[in-house]
A protein has these predicted regions:
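N-terminal zymogen propeptides
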Residues: 1-8, 50, 138, 388-390
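Short hydrophobic beta-strand that contains or immediately precedes a catalytic carboxylate
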Residues: 14-16, 22-26, 32-34, 125-126, ...
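Short strand-coil-strand connectors
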Residues: 15-19, 97-104, 168, 190, ...
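Aspartyl protease catalytic domain
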Residues: 1-5, 104-262
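Conserved beta-strand elements of beta-rich interaction domains across eukaryotes
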Residues: 30, 39, 113-115, 131-133, ...
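Signature of the N-terminal lobe/flap region of pepsin-like aspartyl proteases
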Residues: 4-121, 293, 315, 323-324
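Aspartic protease catalytic domain
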Residues: 113, 312-390
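Extracytoplasmic, non-cytosolic globular domains
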Residues: 28, 186-195, 201, 205-207, ...
């Protein structure tokens, strides 16, 4: 995988219709899409037309260069992200090849209208979440999309394993790219990458949290798991420290999630494992405690809505407890550049929204997405104690 934007975006190569692209790998969404060669860019604040360079895409997809593209009639793409970015366009089919696995006639979106903060490298995105999150709608005009009336289709990974091309499992080991050479870790489709990881595995169920708008049945959407709680330490600690140590060591503070009214002592909370989100999002109270644990301490900036910290501060150790085991984020990943002379905490408040375990935490953990078994597996990784193959 390729790491760009100071280790905040993770890309993988894909060939579509004979054209090669770098795409964002996102476990928090499902649609595969590319910017079309004739797309229009719109300002992220005013939504007024701007030069296409402002969307900062990599090379766009060119229909005329593909011998295998077919248009999907009477269908359109209407996709919005929590960041406020919006994509509208057409739907088509073409041959996708990723990781040596080829899927012919994969459905995907061609973006004609983009409100997008790009990275200058990626030409689009491939979502690896469940098909229930796909955003294809009836009609050629995406502006006529009706919320809750999307036509669900198989994302790329679904077609890979449903065609028996690979096992229904993939895994990710993200890296910060400490040497600045673009090495963003590894992704394995159909198994686990051959990299060093900790001695203990844990496995937990993926929690179905969505509600089907037609049947009202619970369904899988995101890779949501139950976390036991969170821990915070002013001192660096062992990567594989048990949760008991977090509770007994007076220099470590277990942090609770939202209160369960039936069990007020519970610290459990559902959290989404999302490679497409840079930061970790928890309750505002936990985010404040993490910010204040920096030395010197951070603070909440009312103007930006973020917990900011001095750029020279020493980060704490922040851990997530899953199935009784704490997985710590590398403290070096908790301090992010937020602008000139401005740094932010890698753990931010969700303002009563979703709890998300993003790249800041994922960089220290091998994450296994076992879709076939409906489970996720985790193993700790030593803090960059090995080198990537060139």
């Amino acid at each position: 995988m390729l790491s760009i934007a100071a280790g905040s975006v993770f890309l993988a190569p894909v060939t579509i219709g004979g054209q090669q692209f770098s795409v964002v790998i996102d476990t928090g969404s499902s649609d595969p899409w590319l910017a079309d060669a004739n797309f229009e860019c719109y300002d992220t604040t005013t939504f007024e037309p701007v030069d296409e360079a402002a969307c900062y895409f990599g090379p766009p997809y060119d229909i005329s260069r593909s011998a295998t593209y077919t248009h999907l009639p009477d269908r359109s793409l209407n996709l919005s992200y929590a960041s406020g970015e919006v994509l509208n366009g057409r739907m088509g089919r073409d041959t996708f090849t990723m990781g040596g696995i080829t899927v012919p006639q994969q459905e995907f979106g061609l973006v004609d209208y983009a409100v997008w903060n790009g990275d200058g490298v990626s030409s689009g995105l491939v979502g690896f979440a469940y098909k229930t999150l796909t955003s294809m709608y009836a009609g050629e005009d995406p502006k006529n999309a009706v919320a809750g009336k999307a036509f669900k289709y198989n994302p790329l990974f679904d077609n890979m394993y449903r065609s028996n091309i690979t096992e229904p499992v993939f895994s990710m080991a993200l890296a910060r790219d400490p040497y600045g050479i673009g090495k963003g870790g590894v992704m394995a489709i159909g198994g686990i990458p051959d990299i060093p990881f900790g001695p203990t595995w844990i496995s937990v169920p993926i929690v179905p949290v969505g509600i089907n708008g037609t049947s009202n049945e619970i369904e899988y959407q995101f890779y949501t798991i139950v976390t036991d709680g969170f821990s915070l330490s002013a001192d660096p600690s062992a990567q594989f420290a048990p949760i008991a140590a977090a509770k007994l060591n007076p220099r470590k503070t277990p942090l609770k999630g939202p209160v369960d009214r039936k069990n007020p002592n519970s610290t459990t909370v559902n959290a989404i494992v999302d490679s497409g989100t840079t930061l970790v999002y928890v309750s505002d109270s936990i985010a404040l405690q993490v910010a204040q644990a920096f030395d010197p301490p951070g603070y909440f900036n009312e103007e930006t809505g973020l917990y900011e910290v001095p750029c020279g501060a020493t980060p704490p150790t922040f851990g997530v407890s899953i199935a009784g085991k704490v997985f710590n984020a590398n403290p070096d990943d908790l301090l992010l550049q937020g602008g000139p002379d401005r740094c932010v905490s890698g753990v931010q408040g969700n303002h009563n929204g979703l709890w998300i375990l993003g790249d800041v935490w994922m960089k220290s953990v091998l994450c296994v997405f076992d879709v076939g078994a409906g489970r996720m597996g985790f193993a700790g990784r030593q803090y960059y104690g090995f080198t990537w193959d060139e």
